[in-house]
A protein has these predicted regions:
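Conserved donor NDP-sugar-binding/catalytic core segment of glycosyltransferases
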Residues: 89-125
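Acidic donor-binding segment of Leloir-type glycosyltransferases
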Residues: 25-60, 72
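A short, conserved alpha-helix in the catalytic core of glycosyltransferases
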Residues: 143, 149-161, 165-180
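Cell-envelope/extracellular polymer assembly enzymes that use nucleotide-activated donors
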Residues: 7-9, 33, 174
Length: 180
C-alpha cells in the first residue's frame, strides 16, 4: 500500500505540551488522522484537545518514556504509515506532499524523515548552505533525528518498534540501526 494522507496517522507524544501542540496540529492537513499520547497523566490536555478537535484520539497515560508512548500510538494507529512527530514540529509549505511524492517512487524504506535546517548524524553534520547547494532527493543515513519519523509499518512485520528500555534519547537511533 502506498503512502497517502488517507493511509497515514500522525502520532504526537506530549508531556505537558499544551503551549506548543496547537501550532503543530494547525500545520497538519485538514482531516488528518491524529493520535496524541499525553505522558503526564494530566487530563486537562485531553479535555481541551477533545473539545477543540473531537476527531483526534487522545490517550493519557503514565510516563513510561518516549519510546513506550510512541509504541502505544503506533499500535493504536490503523493505517500502514505512522508519522511520529514531536509537539513542536510545524510542517511548512509542501513538506508533506514532497514526502508523499518521494514515497510513491521509493517505497522500499522502513523509516523516512524530512531534513531539518540543522541535522546531526554520527560524525556527520549537514548545514543549510550544504542542503541548498546540493540537488538530491534523499540521503541514506544511519540514523535520523526523532523529531519527525515516518514509519512504514509494512516493514515491521514483528511489530517491534521503539525499544522501551530507552526512556528518553537514543530510542530513535536504536530503532534506525536495527532497521538498517
Amino acid at each position: 500500500m502506498t503512502l497517502s494522507l488517507n493511509n497515514l496517522t500522525f502520532i504526537i507524544v506530549t508531556f505537558k505540551s499544551e503551549h506548543i501542540i496547537y501550532e503543530c496540529i494547525k500545520s497538519l492537513p485538514k482531516n488528518s488522522k491524529i493520535i496524541v499520547i499525553e505522558n503526564s497523566n494530566d487530563q486537562k490536555l485531553k479535555k481541551d484537545l477533545e473539545e477543540k478537535y473531537p476527531e483526534i484520539k487522545v490517550i493519557v497515560q503514565e510516563n513510561n518514556g518516549m519510546g513506550s508512548a510512541n509504541n502505544t500510538g503506533i499500535r493504536l494507529c490503523e493505517t500502514d504509515y505512522a508519522f511520529v512527530i514531536n509537539p513542536d514540529v510545524k510542517f511548512h509549505n509542501n513538506t508533506l506532499q514532497e514526502i508523499i511524492s518521494f514515497s510513491e517512487k521509493n517505497d522500499d524504506y522502513s523509516i523516512l524523515a524530512p531534513i531539518s535546517d540543522d541535522v546531526r548524524f554520527p560524525n556527520y553534520k549537514i548545514k543549510n548552505k550544504e542542503i541548498a547547494s546540493n540537488n538530491f532527493d534523499y540521503l541514506s543515513v544511519d540514523s535520523v533525528d526523532g523529531f519527525a519519523m515516518l514509519i512504514n509499518k509494512n516493514k515491521f512485520k514483528d511489530n517491534i518498534y521503539f525499544d522501551e528500555n530507552f526512556f528518553l534519547y537514543l530510542e530513535n537511533d536504536d530503532l534506525c540501526l536495527r532497521k538498517k
